[in-house]
């Protein structure tokens, strides 16, 4: 089964994207398989609304370790299963909390082994510093993904008015990336993401 | 600090020794090294395997020498390009001259694989055509057929056997049109395919003399000399070994006499390695008939071709 890993900074909307994308693909309920950093696997069954209430939030590092969903996509006359894995957000600096550091290490481990990378970028977080120094972790993820040729940038939070003027700058910041503007909250741009999944299965 | 294994990087993040951004850069370097090394090693190994396959062919020392020269030339052109020096254009259209069964098609097949490995050809396939595949029957038909073959050969080698037959029909024949189209295609698509014209020595020389424009467009001319009797014997032994058969010393002498007789008596139509293959296959069938008469056979009997099996082979 092909595995698509969703990575990005903390609070960029990875979990909300994963759950709303599952809903867009026709799932009413989801089995969330979590794998802790010591390889303890647990499975929880949720409705999409319950999952969003429990797993998403405004606090940083709400997702401390990877959690996967198995979804179906119709290809021709058959349905093909694929795995989408939501990860712990990664930042530029060494985190003081060991649990979070382990979560980040697990994210990078999955990033290396995944078949495809969906990099969620919080467009509202693009600042002048980004434009000048390009020091954000997002550039490191981008550089890693581009080299591996199995990467798509999902420019998230396009529903916010402040992001409108920033979208055109993405072509300058991430020139080689295949970019899809999305709103994880409003499920916008998911048709293109679905096409991307179908294309890379 | 340098990290050798990806697991060490993961541990370093967990311990708080390096930030995730640094880890990603380490991973990138690590993956790049692994990929580059494996690509270079695989490509080099495949190129060596192909050259080994060529070296394994009996005789053809001139052919082997020219292929090595081409390899060295291409390699040096690449190195010059890296140093921003002037490079010679790589025109690799060839003429193969030799009697039937001297290995022209076999060498062309090996060359197609070789050129793909060293990056000259994108697909490295061989399209083998003759007059009938290129020359049409009515006006406009030849252009259509020739263009189709050139298109098919894109990324590979277009091998025209008995190429002189294109000029066989004289001025009014459509063969001349095919030649003109091929010359144009060689110029227009020079980086996309390699054209090899093959045929008997004498006829090819006559063909090139009557079409002086052609000669200058083929920088590489390779002669395929007839095999000596000893070389033919080695080829026969190779063929027998490949089919899990064997011959005794006495039978070897019989086979040698048979090959020499073939070379002396029917020289004009002698098919060299192809004739050897036919002789071997006939002998194998004769052996089968001989053994069928016996009720039971030993492993040794099944393995050995006797002198008597070669006697009746013509």
Tell me what each language-model feature is.
Chain A
Residues 100-104, 137-138, 166:
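Amphipathic coiled-coil/heptad-repeat helices and related helical stalk/stem segments
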Residues 68-72, 105-110:
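Conserved alpha-helical scaffold flanking the Walker A/P-loop in AAA+ ATPase domains
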Residues 1-92:
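Conserved G1/Walker A P-loop phosphate-binding module
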Residues 84, 120, 154:
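Generic enzyme active-site microenvironment
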Residues 89-97, 111-135, 158-163:
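Conserved Switch II/interswitch segment of TRAFAC-class P-loop GTPases
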Residues 152, 157-201:
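Canonical P-loop GTPase G-domain recognition
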Residues 79-83, 115-116, 150-151:
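Loop/turn-to-beta-strand initiation segments
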Residues 142-148, 174:
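Short, conserved loop/helix-junction motifs that constitute active-site signature segments
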